DNA sequence: GGGCGCCCAAATA
DNA sequence: TATTTGTGCGCCC
């Protein structure tokens, strides 16, 4: 389920439910997701209290005295907090039970996600990540400067997590539409002015999506703890043959780097 | 830098 | 019933 806004909403939903909660039991319902889930979490996290929850890129970082639990939701992961007696659902692979009688469960049908642990909070997977798109370091000159001499297409470029994190397939399409840039354009062949516009569009699109997701938070701990995708805000993604908001021509679908791209041939140049 | 493949389920043919 | 497609991303060539 996750792109950056969905992970951010998950984080915000978790904060009031699990901060300061003490772990009574850790359950691994299977040994691995994308990678092995460390078995020693069962002993390491026992009786540990959750201190903070942060997000870096699409990783959730849940901090304990003993170290940091690193969770990635992959393509289909979601987290919910339920009463401990709630029957376990299919694909709920990992569970943290708390002394207050609730349980945080990770559901991930495709199992592309990950549950990892780091004593000092650092991790190989976090080392080579680019800047956060909603922070000030992602400024108007950043993409322009990073894109010089890049021959790959601009969509792939903004989806490169070594450059900027958290821009997935949906919001890459949406941002390029909002900025009126053709996704097939070579990254190194886009002007400083257009990158400035694109930068603001990425920030706007992500911020809007987080805002839309915020409305789902009151239901976060209910039966459906999955905030889902905020489809009401999408202008091009999944909109093949639908009408462009601006010029009324048809949105088309192409394939780039084995991923679907949706765009308006007339508006995006 | 491009493409593969991990895995399951829903949509489509 | 069989095939295609999908919100991610590390790894291999």
UniProtKB/Swiss-Prot annotation:
Its cofactor is Zn(2+). PROSITE patterns: FPG_CAT, ZF_FPG_1, ZF_FPG_2. The keyword DNA damage applies. InterPro entries: DNA_glyclase/AP_lyase_DNA-bd, DNA_glyclase_Znf_dom_DNA_BS, Formamido-pyr_DNA_Glyclase, FPG_cat, MutM-like_N-ter, Ribosomal_uS13-like_H2TH, Znf_DNA_glyclase/AP_lyase. GO terms for molecular function: 8-oxo-7,8-dihydroguanine DNA N-glycosylase activity; class I DNA-(apurinic or apyrimidinic site) endonuclease activity; damaged DNA binding; zinc ion binding. It catalyses: Hydrolysis of DNA containing ring-opened 7-methylguanine residues, releasing 2,6-diamino-4-hydroxy-5-(N-methyl)formamidopyrimidine; 2'-deoxyribonucleotide-(2'-deoxyribose 5'-phosphate)-2'-deoxyribonucleotide-DNA = a 3'-end 2'-deoxyribonucleotide-(2,3-dehydro-2,3-deoxyribose 5'-phosphate)-DNA + a 5'-end 5'-phospho-2'-deoxyribonucleoside-DNA + H(+). It comes from the Bacteria. DNA binds at residues 91, 110, 150. Binds 1 zinc ion per subunit. GO terms for biological process: base-excision repair. Its EC number is 3.2.2.23, 4.2.99.18. CDD domains: EcFpg-like_N (cd08966). Keywords: DNA damage, DNA repair, DNA-binding, Glycosidase, Hydrolase, Lyase, Metal-binding, Multifunctional enzyme, Zinc, Zinc-finger. Pfam families: Fapy_DNA_glyco (PF01149), H2TH (PF06831). The active site is at 2 (schiff-base intermediate with dna), 3 (proton donor), 58 (proton donor), 259 (proton donor). SMART domains: Fapy_DNA_glyco, H2TH. A zinc finger (FPG-type) spans 235-269. NCBIfam families: fpg, PRK01103.1. Belongs to the FPG family. Monomer. Involved in base excision repair of DNA damaged by oxidation or by mutagenic agents. Acts as a DNA glycosylase that recognizes and removes damaged bases. Has a preference for oxidized purines, such as 7,8-dihydro-8-oxoguanine (8-oxoG). Has AP (apurinic/apyrimidinic) lyase activity and introduces nicks in the DNA strand. Cleaves the DNA backbone by beta-delta elimination to generate a single-strand break at the site of the removed base with both 3'- and 5'-phosphates. This is Formamidopyrimidine-DNA glycosylase. It comes from Ruthia magnifica subsp. Calyptogena magnifica.
């Amino acid at each position: 389920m996750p792109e950056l806004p969905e992970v951010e909403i998950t984080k915000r939903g978790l904060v009031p439910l699990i901060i300061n909660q003490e772990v009574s039991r850790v359950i691994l319902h299977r040994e691995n997701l994308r990678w092995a889930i460390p078995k020693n979490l069962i002993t390491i996290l026992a009786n540990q209290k959750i201190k903070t929850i942060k997000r870096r890129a699409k990783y959730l970082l849940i901090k304990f005295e003993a170290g940091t639990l690193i969770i990635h939701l992959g393509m289909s992961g979601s987290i919910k907090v339920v009463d401990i007696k709630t029957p376990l659902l299919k694909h709920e692979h990992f569970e943290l039970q708390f002394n207050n009688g609730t349980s945080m469960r990770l559901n991930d049908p495709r199992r592309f996600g990950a549950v990892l642990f780091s004593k000092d909070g650092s991790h190989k997977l976090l080392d080579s990540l680019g800047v956060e798109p909603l922070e000030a370091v992602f400024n108007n000159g950043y993409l322009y400067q990073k894109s010089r001499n890049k021959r790959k297409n601009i969509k792939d470029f903004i989806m490169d997590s070594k450059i900027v994190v958290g821009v997935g397939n949906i919001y890459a399409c949406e941002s390029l539409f909002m900025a009126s840039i053709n996704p097939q354009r070579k990254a190194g062949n886009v002007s400083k002015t257009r990158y400035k516009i694109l930068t603001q569009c990425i920030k706007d699109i992500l911020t809007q999506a987080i805002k839309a997701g915020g409305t789902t938070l009151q239901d976060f701990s209910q039966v459906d703890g999955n905030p889902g995708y905020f489809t009401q805000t999408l202008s091009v993604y999944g909109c093949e043959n639908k009408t462009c908001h601006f010029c009324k021509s048809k949105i088309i679908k192409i394939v780039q780097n084995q991923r679907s791209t949706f765009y308006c041939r007339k508006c995006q140049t």
